[in-house]
Amino acid sequence: MKKLLVFLRDYKKESVLAPLFKLLEASFELFVPLVMAKIIDVGIGTGDNSYVLKMCGVLILLAFIGLTCAITAQYFAAKAAVGFATKLRHALFEHIQKLSFDELDRVGTSTLITRMTSDINQVQSGVNMVLRLFLRSPFIVFGAMVMAFTIDVKAALIFVVTIPALSVVVFGIMYVSIPLFKKVQSGLDEVLSLTRENLEGSRGIRAFRKEQEETAQFEQKNGLLTGMQLHVGKISALMNPLTYIIINFAIVALIWQGGLRVNVGAITQGEVVALVNYMSQILVELVKLANLIVTVNKSVACGNRIAQVLEMESSMEDGTLEIGENFSEQEMQGKKSVVSFEDVAMCYQAVSYTHLRAHETSQDL
């Protein structure tokens, strides 16, 4: 997958600006709970309606700036991802044209089509999401923890316990699911290859009455693919419930601890609401991070499959004789161009034979 990053070389500016604007959006988002705390403690607590309206205007301003940054970041991320996929698709298509029939048959036409279409689309989605969320989500998670410490240290210790527990769940599921996604893609290639063979050879299958055998073989391959997809889907599906359980327990503990701190006058009610909002922000970002991890897992698996084709060397070699270098145009005038084969040996995988004798030309084939 790392070898494919060379196709992002022409989009360095977009690859930097997209995460930068996402970080700006996240920074403004982290100030929202503090503004809410001021509205509750100062505006509502003292009955100052003008202060409430003024701070509501601040919230609208923060939302507008955040929206502008998000749209700008999405533009740069989409431009980089689409440009990356376009260059990768062109490079892959050009490389496939250089492969001999031996390599094409060894890899398989169906899997090449899959890598040209769905695999590249999956990698494009992965690049887009990485540029938008790879820095934003961790920034908000740890930024929310830092902002919680600025409010109250004892209550913020709940964040210190919650974030590592969530990290274990998220990265543990990622560690298990990455190899399974690779197996799913391999199973998809087998099903596509079998489907293509059945469609191209449908007349032969009917002529030899092999419909039942081919149907049974397809059901077997499709069943294996379905089983692998269900297995990896069940593992990935554990992400949301486990993270929600941890976050909800953390919110309960936060409200309980916050209530005790309010009774002793250490913090205010608005600050408790701000702490809960920060915990909710962590929940939302971890859900996004979970979806990002699933997408990145698929993208890495697809990227490795594309890289395998790009690393494949062709057994064909172009000739070095060219008119104008080895032969002058004057020498070629008045002469009939004839392609001749003398003592030519041909081979195809394990089959080889010598057929053409000396002085035979392509017209004798």
Name each model-derived stretch.
Residues 1-10, 112:
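A short amphipathic helical element positioned immediately N-terminal to and/or at the very start
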Residues 9, 15-72, 76, 149-154, ...:
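Transmembrane helix-loop-helix hairpins at lipid-water interfaces of multipass membrane proteins
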Residues 10-13, 98-102, 118-131, 135, ...:
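An intracellular "coupling" helix at the cytosolic face of ABC transporter transmembrane type-1 domains
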Residues 20, 24, 28-32, 57, ...:
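Hydrophobic alpha-helical transmembrane segments of ABC transporter permease domains
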Residues 48-52, 147-161, 231-304, 309-310:
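Helix-loop-helix
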Residues 200, 279-350:
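ABC transporter TMD-NBD coupling linker
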Residues 354-361:
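Conserved small/polar residues in nucleotide/adenosyl-binding loops
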